[in-house]
């Protein structure tokens, strides 16, 4: 009788361990996808905005790219045109990603952008949606950094 109980307890413990491990797998896989998406967007952003490597940056886009920035057309060519115009107008443009968040297929960046080295710059929130590891949609909002503020917290 004791052997049967011990065997039953061992079997129950093994089943509980297997169930816990199986339950952790999807969450771990989701974390992996989120982290991979974040790495993709950060690599894209560095290629596009800091190194001005438009061809390398374009490789991060999916086959259909939806742009919500009113200054840019949809598609890789719309992005390419916008970036070329920005770099021509602001050759000293520099972007410093302060925070990066991933939630499912979305990656959000909080960025300090300086169009000219001597200026205070802009606080920008960039939102990207990815499918199968490729950027397929983009939104952004911009706010100039003021000379003075009502608080001492800073924009970043």
Predicted regions and their residues:
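C-terminal and inter-domain tail/linker signature
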Residues: 2-156
């Amino acid at each position: 009788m004791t052997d049967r109980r011990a065997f039953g307890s061992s079997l129950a413990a093994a089943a509980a361990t297997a169930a816990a491990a199986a339950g952790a797998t999807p969450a771990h896989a989701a974390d992996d996808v989120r982290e991979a998406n974040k790495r993709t967007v950060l690599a894209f952003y560095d290629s596009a905005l800091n190194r001005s490597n438009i061809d390398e940056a374009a490789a991060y886009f999916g086959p259909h790219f939806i742009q919500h920035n009113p200054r840019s057309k949809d598609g890789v060519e719309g992005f390419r045109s916008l970036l070329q115009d920005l770099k021509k107008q602001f050759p000293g443009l520099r972007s410093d990603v302060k925070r990066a968040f991933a939630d499912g297929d979305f990656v959000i960046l909080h960025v300090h952008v300086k169009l000219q080295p001597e200026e205070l710059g802009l606080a920008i929130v960039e939102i990207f949606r990815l499918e199968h590891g490729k950027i397929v949609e983009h939104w952004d909002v911009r706010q100039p950094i003021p000379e003075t503020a009502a608080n001492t917290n800073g924009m970043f």
